[in-house]
């Protein structure tokens, strides 16, 4: 049975459309500061287009600096095509736990008024993946500058761009490939920018969500069923370095989910996974267990609870979202207890990332030295069912990128600790009192399962 599944997975991957790549066309960036430097450099050199898809673009010092760069280059070149796609709901609310004030969308309006470009174009667009943020957001990643794709799970704000002391660690790849860039831009224009549900954010007369609920539902359904990247000169899996862009939305017919599952079935020696939140969908849990049963090696690099962006230090006032890092840690503890023998033998390596009070946002999959998945997908039930996600699958049959891959992985491991035993992780009775109360309440009313599905 497993042989049949493995063969089918191999056929699925072989049938994906790929674009041939040269090794010199892809560059792995090593830090959030380098990512910011590249964004600014690529903006300044853009001649025909700048397309950005991100969860949010924050009103803060880094957000202002990058937006000033965009407006400056737009002033110099009015014909430059600039489009920024942000989650509709996220742009119009304040940060969790923050006092009510002007939103990011309000700031986009102010900036448009401040700069007053001659043709006064809309640049920011709100993409509603569902009628409520909790049931789905725009988690599609990738910045396009002319023929260059800068791919990362990062959004635009102070910590993602290491504006001050703190940073949020992600992965960053720069791929210079005209057809890949065209494919990503065409996907935005053909599928994401459906103006029956997608509205400009840099205007004051935005519709209220409840006024366009029907349009949003129809938009989500159409995007889930039809959204895909098209490649003009695609080839079936060639025996050369190549890349395939992927999209997925919803629990069924989700190409990105299917590819991730197929990758897990293609492991011959070793699987490496990065995720900030230890909360795998059941299907991936089963596949990891099967790999371990079959003697394959698995390495999981996950953020320590302190490196979670929801973490609240015990001395600060507690908010409900602050329980999430503890919930993820309790998941991890159970997992490590279950596979205690494999951890002791070194077959399963679990690494916890922590660097002071900086945060960890990495996600990705590496299969042997053949497949590299760049994605914003957190490999959790929410990504599997609710959010719009994308990814770039790189196939490297001749290990042309091996040196860059090993360098990236070693950088990721730099601030990690290998777990030797599950008891190194705290358990419920060691958590702060408010966290204990909330997690016990969740368990009592069976809300913990629901929380894991949507967060």
From Swiss-Prot:
PROSITE patterns (alphabetical): PLD
Domain named PLD phosphodiesterase: residues: 134-160, 356-383
Principal localisation: cytoplasm
An MF annotation (GO) of this entry: CDP-diacylglycerol-glycerol-3-phosphate 3-phosphatidyltransferase activity
InterPro entries: PGS1, PLD-like_dom, PLipase_D/transphosphatidylase
GO cellular component labels: cytosol; plasma membrane
Membrane-related topology note: Peripheral membrane protein
Catalytic reactions on record: a CDP-1,2-diacyl-sn-glycerol + L-serine = a 1,2-diacyl-sn-glycero-3-phospho-L-serine + CMP + H(+)
Keywords: Cell inner membrane, Cell membrane, Cytoplasm, Lipid biosynthesis, Lipid metabolism, Membrane, Phospholipid biosynthesis, Phospholipid metabolism, Repeat, Transferase
Coiled-coil regions, chain positions: none
Gene3D superfamilies in UniProt: Endonuclease Chain A (3.30.870.10)
EC number of the protein: 2.7.8.8
Subcellular location: Cytoplasm; Cell inner membrane
GO biological process: cardiolipin biosynthetic process
Highest taxon in the source lineage: Bacteria
Record-stated family: Belongs to the CDP-alcohol phosphatidyltransferase class-II family.
Binding partners and assembly: Multimeric.
Listed name of the protein: CDP-diacylglycerol--serine O-phosphatidyltransferase
């Amino acid at each position: 049975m497993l042989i049949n599944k493995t063969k089918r997975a191999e056929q699925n991957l072989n049938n994906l459309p790929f674009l041939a790549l040269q090794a010199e066309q892809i560059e792995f960036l090593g830090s959030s500061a380098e990512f910011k430097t590249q964004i600014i450099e690529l903006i300044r050199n853009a001649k025909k287009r700048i397309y950005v898809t991100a969860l949010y673009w924050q009103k803060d010092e880094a957000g202002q600096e990058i937006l000033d760069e965009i407006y400056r280059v737009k002033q110099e070149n009015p014909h430059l095509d600039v489009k920024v796609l942000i989650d509709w709901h996220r742009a119009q609310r304040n940060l969790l736990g923050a006092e009510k004030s002007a939103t990011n969308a309000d700031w986009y309006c102010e900036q448009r008024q401040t700069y007053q470009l001659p043709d006064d174009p809309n640049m920011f667009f709100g993409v509603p993946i569902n009628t409520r943020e909790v049931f789905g957001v725009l988690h599609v990643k990738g910045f396009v500058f002319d023929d260059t794709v800068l791919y990362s799970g990062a959004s635009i704000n102070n910590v993602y761009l290491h504006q001050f002391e703190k940073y949020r660690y992600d992965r960053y790849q720069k791929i210079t490939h005209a057809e890949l860039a065209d494919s990503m831009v065409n996907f935005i224009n053909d599928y994401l920018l459906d103006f029956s549900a997608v509205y400009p954010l840099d205007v004051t007369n935005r519709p209220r969500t409840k006024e366009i609920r029907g349009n949003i539902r129809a938009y989500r359904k159409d995007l889930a069923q039809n959204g895909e990247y098209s490649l003009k000169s695609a080839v079936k899996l060639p025996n050369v370095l190549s890349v395939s862009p992927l999209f997925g939305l919803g629990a069924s017919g989700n190409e990105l989910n299917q590819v991730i599952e197929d990758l897990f079935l293609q492991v011959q020696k070793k699987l490496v996974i990065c995720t900030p939140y230890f909360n795998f969908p059941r299907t991936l849990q089963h596949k990891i267990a099967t790999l371990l049963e079959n003697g394959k090696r698995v390495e999981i690099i996950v953020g320590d609870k302190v490196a979670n962006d929801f973490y609240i230090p015990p001395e600060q006032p507690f908010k409900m979202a602050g329980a999430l890092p503890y919930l993820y840690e309790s998941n991890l503890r159970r997992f490590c207890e279950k596979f205690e023998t494999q951890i002791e033998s070194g077959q399963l390596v679990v690494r916890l990332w922590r660097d002071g009070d900086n945060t960890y946002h990495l996600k990705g999959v590496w299969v042997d030295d053949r497949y590299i998945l760049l994605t914003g997908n957190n490999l959790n039930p929410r990504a599997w069912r609710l959010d719009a996600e994308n990814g770039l699958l790189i196939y490297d049959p001749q290990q042309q990128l091996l040196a860059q891959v090993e360098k990236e992985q070693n950088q990721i491991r730099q601030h990690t600790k290998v777990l030797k035993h599950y008891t190194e992780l705290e358990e419920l009775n060691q958590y702060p009192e408010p966290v204990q109360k909330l997690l016990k309440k969740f368990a009592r009313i069976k809300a913990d399962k629901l929380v894991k599905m949507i967060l």
